[in-house]
Amino acid sequence: AMALARRKGIDSPVPTLVKMLDLPNTETRYGACRALAQFRGKAAPAVPALQKNLKHDDLWMRVHAAQTLAAIGQSAMSTLPELLTMVAKGATKEDPRAMEQRYLSFALFNARGGMLSRSLNGVDRELLYKAVKAGLKNEDGRARGSYSSIYTKLSLEELKPILPDIYRAIIEPSPSGIMFADQIQTAGLELFAKHRISEGIELTAAYAKNMKPHASEHRIKTVMTLMKSYGAHSQRAIPILENAIDYFDNREPDFPKRLSKQKAQTVRDTIKEIKTSTNRPKLISIKSFL
């Protein structure tokens, strides 16, 4: 497929591949999708046939069709309402772990190549909100993480309908795909700090201790920077931070002791700084949205 897409001086195979999308054999259709994806925008004539396959009985056929539409890009944006509706559907009896939603999350929201990775201009906000609300409940950490791409593309006013869902995605880590579970949690904490959301203070302090251990010796620096951004308001979370210090110094299991001590010192330095802070930025609360 890659060789076909790169070959010059030959008739385009796109029309033939489009015809293959209507053949009875699903494996043949899969192959046509993978090949068409290599042509990117040049595969625009395949959009109607691919959209038809979004209704196929086979889950993986629907996934392949969605991935190919995402690869086509701008010429396939007309299918976005249907794709967002599919994401919003979530888990079903036939798909209890929402695998369809998982792969569509990547196709639409992945920061690298997702259909919505560059802009949300013209996107129906109600459909977007429904998709994000459902997607942030996906059991897979990497799938949830893909939704962080929209956090910086929406104003605070636009974020309000999904703030409760962003909040839950911070405090309830994904049960699988834990290697990537921190992405959506950290992105949520960064968003709360950016908009000075009061609840972010305790969430950030608690996350210092509760984040996944892998690479936490690096991540703790980012988390403490967020902590300090709240200024003197962070003083109310000092007991939580002191508990984290005790945990790192004395109780953290299965983690290099030297790195645990390093994390403890990072938190100590943060406490020292916020104790002397006089900066009190204006905070807002999300209680009215929960």
Regions found by a protein language model. Name each.
Residues A1-G9, K19, E27-K42, K52, ...:
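Structural detector for internal amphipathic alpha-helices that build alpha-solenoid repeat scaffolds
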Residues G9-D22, G41-K55, Q74-G90, M115-A134, ...:
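Amphipathic alpha-helical scaffolding segments comprising HEAT/armadillo-like alpha-solenoid repeats
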Residues V14, C33, K287-L290:
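Alpha-helix capping/termination motifs at helix-coil junctions
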Residues K89-P96, A134-E139, A169-M179, N210-A215, ...:
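Helix-loop junctions that connect tandem helical modules in alpha-solenoid scaffolds
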Residues M227, I245-D249:
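Short leucine-rich amphipathic alpha-helical surface patches
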Residues T276-F289:
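Short, low-complexity, Pro/Ser/Thr/Gly-rich segments in the mature regions of secreted, periplasmic
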